[in-house]
Amino acid sequence: MNRLRVLVAALCGLVSAQALGEAADTIYRNGSILTMDGDKPTYVEALAVKDGRIVFAGPKAGALAMKGGATKVVDLEGKALLPGFIDAHGHYINSLLVANQAKLYPPPSGPGKDVPSIIAALKQYAEERKIPKGELITAYGYDDSVMPDGRLLNRDDLDAALPDNPVRVDHVSMHGAVLNSLALKKFGISAETKTPPGGVIVRKPGTQEPWGLIMETAFLPVFDKTPPMTARQEIEWTRAAQMLYAEAGMTTAHEGATHLGQIQSIRRATDAGANIIDVVAYPFITDLDKILAGFPVGTWGQYDKHFRIGGVKITLDGSPQGRTAFFTTPYLTGGPGGEKNWTGEPTFPQDLANKAMKKVYELGVPAIVHTNGDAAIDMFLQAYEFAREGNHDRPWNVTTIHTQFMRKDHIPQFVKYKVRPSFYTLHTFYFADTHIANRGKEQGSYISPMRDAIDAGLRPTNHTDFVVAPLDQMFMLWSAVNRISRAGAEVGPGQRVTPYEGLKSMTEWAAEQYGEQDRKGTLEVGKLADLVILDKDPLKVDRMAIKDIRVVETIKEGRTIYPASASSLPPIPTAAKDSGKTYAWTSRPCDMAGVNTAAGRVWTLTTLGGEKVDLAKPPTMQFAGGRLSVFGGVNQLSGSYALVDDGVTMGELVSTKKAGPPERMALEDRFAKALKSVDAFRVQGDELTLSSGGKEVAAFVAAK
């Protein structure tokens, strides 16, 4: 009988060889099951899943022939079933922070339409979380460009609402924040604080008192004084962050600008078993050598507990709304600092961009390249040609990220080189008015030209750039299909795509961008059962209603991960090295003997590796608030520490790149290597000793 039923299944549809003689774990039926396979929409009556993979897609009779005693049959009740959405570009590591913050995006993505709404949302967040007095309250998504009548959020607003807590409200650009009085004090910003070059500290009218908003370089000390995550937080915040993706129907997350310390953090959480979706990281080209030292390229590419390194990130310019994107013609509104005839600037000169692309090509890994302005895209194409040296036979997976101001003459070159553009159509809603003001109507309306790219034979992807824009795949699809600004104006309607093409850019074509088209992106036999259930079919509703479609359920490899109430997820794992007694370097009292006298003092290096350091200007070190600052004699190094029980956990060390006398450079290198190995310390009066594995590696004396 079993053989007969399997034969029926094989005759009625597609069934995998491994499913022969085996009952399915789950069968989905009675809905719009959209496979996303092919140039035109294809629906099947039923889908069967076994051991995390799709084993049947076809007629209902064939699927039901695979029903066993333990098979779960899901009646979709007319809802839509699609492949799980794939994040084409975003900043996953930042989601670990915002998952534990109040969301203040303006409508339609959040409550932050004006100052009273922001204050109400912050108070509600603090009450729901039962945040105790004195604890920092953080939020993200504040957009001052949409505040009515120019009434902006300031410290007085935050002080009145939350007088007993430091409050930090991050700007939507992630380049600044509004702080209340307690937060300004916490981060050491006062009337006496000078505005650093390239920074902004908004002052209260008629005074030098900070009024709350700090931006750019003035914002950097806030990061420097923010303690690193504990081992427990890495795990708990990973799970909370990945639930944000699951809630949006996403089964693969993109970490598109990764430093070494962040990869190490993701790896630790991965090894602890925290992941419920796939995470793919693309380290910065500037960190590549350091990352290769710890993560050889032979370990890239293949998932290990749902994490892998996917390639290398190169950034060639800034943002068009911030007027830092690089163009061939000047901005109509000048530069961000009032510069005339301002075209923006590249992140790297052309020769360095060439070398960077060549390095990635020779390494044999994919490249993702941030290009916003048309001049940056010109730079990319030149660097691509330099790397290839005319040899285009070897496949090379290259994607340009954002690609917003692609010119029409760029498209044939992308086709020729088989480069995939990843577009950012959400800007047609959020920033179209700004782009048109900065670049003129013709160029500002041609942003993210997805229609022309598809018509030329390209298979572009689309992305949210989360956390810069909200993690809302249906709103992203709506923006690609409709191209309507926040003010209700059409923005380049000739570049609209069909709903099916828009879905392609976040499923099949996104899988191709990752090089994972053999396992993701379509509902085909043998592929992973990464699925999303929507309350409506995007192809069967009015185009303007697409943004209102909601995610009902998200399934990763056959297991429900959203909603949490219906999921079969295991408990959040416990950090192996975290006993719940974790301390950050601080000047406040704690159980670690000697830390009170050690933090905040200037420590001068006296011995290194058992050898006396006898220099007129020896290296010095300071630490406080979880941050470490070192002057090596030529270069400045910075990093982070955490005290765990009786030991020290070192974070990433980053150094400036100045050159100096060979003997000083050699000493710096030895000093940096010693610091990276530290696992314990001892303070005796004005003397500090650092050790590794029970052996002293460096000794210091405190400045008098």
Please describe what each predicted stretch is:
Residues 2-20:
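Gram-negative bacterial Sec-dependent N-terminal signal peptides
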Residues 23-29, 38-295, 301, 310, ...:
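Divalent metal-binding segments
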Residues 51, 133, 525-528, 557, ...:
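Short, flexible surface segments
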Residues 60-61, 108, 141-143, 173, ...:
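A mature extracytoplasmic/lumenal domain signature
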Residues 236, 357-368, 375-398, 402-403, ...:
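His/Asp/Glu-enriched, well-ordered alpha-helical/loop segment
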Residues 563-581:
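Extracellular/periplasmic ectodomains of large secreted or surface enzymes and adhesion receptors
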Residues 575-704:
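Lipid interaction determinants
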